[in-house]
């Protein structure tokens, strides 16, 4: 099973503290059915797609649903054909908050974490949400303004 670290994490902490490792992967030639089965079995939302041990893309539950809704045959469509290959990746030392902002800007829910060209982990918006909510409940209400400045309203 795939897991996360189980200690208190703050929005300013590096994303490596919340990323999933090991990373669930599939080969580019894996069928849509195999992708869906892996997502369901591991109870995860995305898989890294690899070819010759190199990261080629990411395929998510959203990709599977989109292709099925368009009438794709699960037996004939591969992970390589479904995956997003114009990848946005993050570094393990990027902050949780910076990664959350990047996900919002890119409108994605999962990002591979890459270090020295190798897959170091994967992070989901769900992982980040937990940290951001915990941080907000400890500090009071946190409001992010467009400039990126942070305004903290203390609750008494």
Locations of regions flagged by a protein language model:
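Tandem CBS (Cystathionine beta-synthase) repeat/Bateman regulatory domains
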Residues: 1-156
């Amino acid at each position: 099973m795939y897991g996360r670290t189980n200690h208190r994490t703050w929005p300013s902490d590096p994303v490596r503290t919340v990323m999933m490792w090991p990373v669930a992967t599939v080969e580019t030639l894996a069928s849509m059915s195999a992708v869906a089965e892996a997502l369901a079995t591991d109870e995860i939302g995305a898989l890294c797609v690899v070819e010759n041990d190199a990261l080629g893309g990411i395929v998510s539950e959203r990709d599977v649903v989109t292709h099925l809704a368009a009438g794709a045959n699960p037996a004939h469509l591969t992970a390589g054909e479904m995956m997003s290959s114009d990848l946005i990746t993050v570094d393990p030392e990027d902050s949780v908050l910076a990664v959350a902002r990047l996900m919002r800007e890119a409108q994605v829910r999962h990002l591979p974490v890459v270090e020295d060209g190798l897959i170091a982990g994967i992070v989901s918006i769900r992982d980040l949400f937990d940290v951001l909510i915990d941080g907000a409940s400890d500090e009071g209400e946190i409001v992010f303004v467009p400039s990126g400045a942070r305004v903290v309203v203390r609750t008494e």
